[in-house]
Amino acid sequence: MRLSLILSATLAATMPVQAATHCAAATQFVGTICTPSSSGQHPVILLLGGSEGGNEMSHSASRFADAGFVAASVAYFGLPGLPQTLEEIPVETVGKALDAIGARTDVDKNRIGIFGISKGGEFALLAASTYPQIHAVVADVPSPFAWQSIPRGAETNAHSSWTVGGKPVAFVPYSATMGQLFAQAFGGHGPLDLRPGYDAAMKDNAAAIPGAMFHLENVHGPILFIAADDDHIWDSVAQSELGVQYLKAHNHPYDDVYQHFAGAGHIFLFATPQYALTEVPIGPTTTMLLGGTAQANLAAASQAWPQILSFLSAALKNG
């Protein structure tokens, strides 16, 4: 089962439904817009999924709308009209969504936030560093710097994940360990554990990290970093802490927050009693490790969601 299909099932049950909302396909960008049932102008939250691609965050959009936000899932690869792989994705994809959302009469364009998970968290931090109209960021198990794009099959050429103004963003490349891990996993030698590959790349290519860091000092609002210490995709704790250190070093004048969840895995935030997953099938005989335990992931999710909504309420809903 593809990770995107599993996320479809888990996202739909993540947050309790509080009121009827209306959801419709976006017309000026690829995604879904969900609106609260109440009238008036509302704060906005843009939602970016991870390396599963597609429009999977549409399932969370309705839940954020139930909490009083105009919520828009923004797809950025893997659907018609978009790049088919997570490679050199234009940050202007988010800019187009911002323009479309900002023109709506039911939103307060001065209260716009962005949420991203994993690669979407990486993308959200780049977007918020680029567009001053974003005033709050929730970065779930993110990277505060650009990583190499996810390879296409056996391709070995390194590309950036993102572009700004048509130019590739400086990035941290993978090391040889990453290719070895894929070869071992798909050669029948155990599950795919990406964490050692990212750890090796951070060590071997440490000199590239400063140049690949996003200009988080340009973010016009607070950032919530969420990390999981049993993350088997990448070290979201170390990466989030690099982001926090960068903000402090650059005197970011907002109430930034760092939440670290012990024992939790990469997609803990979307854990439910039915889908508190610690690994996922990625082929007929291969699984990919996500980390955590069912119990730890469920406990962390139950703590994290109220914190996310409280953070966004303080940053956006209360002006």
Regions from the language model: what does each represent?
Residues A65-G81:
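Conserved alpha/beta-hydrolase
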Residues E56, H232-L242, N251, L269-F270:
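Conserved alpha/beta-hydrolase "acid-adjacent" motif
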Residues T85-T105, L126:
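Alpha/beta-hydrolase active-site loop
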Residues H42, G49-G54, S118:
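Active-site glycine-rich loops that stabilize anionic/oxyanionic intermediates
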Residues D106-S118:
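Alpha/beta-hydrolase fold nucleophile elbow
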Residues Q18-P43:
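N-terminal cap/lid segment of alpha/beta-hydrolase-fold proteins
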Residues V219, F225-A227, D231:
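Short beta-strand/loop motif that positions the catalytic acidic residue
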Residues S129, A136-N218, T272:
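Accessory cap/linker subdomain of secreted extracellular hydrolases
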